[in-house]
Regions:
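Short glycine/proline-centered loop/turn elements that form peptide/ligand docking sites
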Residues: 52, 75-80, 97-101
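Acetyl-CoA-dependent GNAT
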Residues: 1-34, 39, 52-53, 58, ...
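Short strand-loop junctions, especially beta-strand C-caps/beta-turns
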Residues: 36, 41, 72-74
Length: 101
C-alpha cells in the first residue's frame, strides 16, 4: 500500500469480506476512492455501500470537499456504477486518448 493510501477492511465472523482504499489529494481538497472490493459471497448485503459511506465521512473529516471514484464503463462494472450513483456520485465525462505503439 502506498504511503498516501489509507485502507480499511470489513470483517464478518472474524474474516475479511471487503475493503476500501482512499487517497487524499489535499492540494485539490479531493478524496479519491482508489479501490473498493467485496467478496462475491458477501455481495448484495450493503458492505460496499457501508465502506463507501465510511470513507466519505472520513474524507470530509479530513477536510476534503470533493470525493471522486473511477470505474469502468463495461457491463462488469454496472453494479459498481449503480452503487456510486445511489450514493450521490455524478458522472463526469473524461476524454481519453490512445495511440497504438
Amino acid at each position: 500500500v502506498a504511503e498516501d493510501t489509507n485502507v480499511w477492511v470489513a470483517i464478518a465472523s472474524g474474516s475479511p469480506v471487503g475493503f476500501i482504499a482512499v487517497k487524499l489529494h489535499s492540494e485539490d481538497s479531493m478524496g479519491e476512492i482508489y479501490m473498493v472490493a467485496v467478496d462475491p459471497d458477501f455481495q448484495g448485503q450493503g458492505i460496499g455501500s457501508t465502506l463507501i459511506k465510511f470513507a466519505l465521512d472520513w474524507m470530509k473529516d479530513a477536510g476534503m470537499s470533493i470525493a471522486m471514484v473511477k470505474t469502468g464503463g463495461d457491463r462488469g462494472h454496472a453494479v459498481a456504477r449503480h452503487t456510486y450513483e445511489k450514493l450521490g456520485f455524478e458522472l463526469f465525462p473524461v476524454a481519453r486518448y490512445f495511440k497504438k505503439l
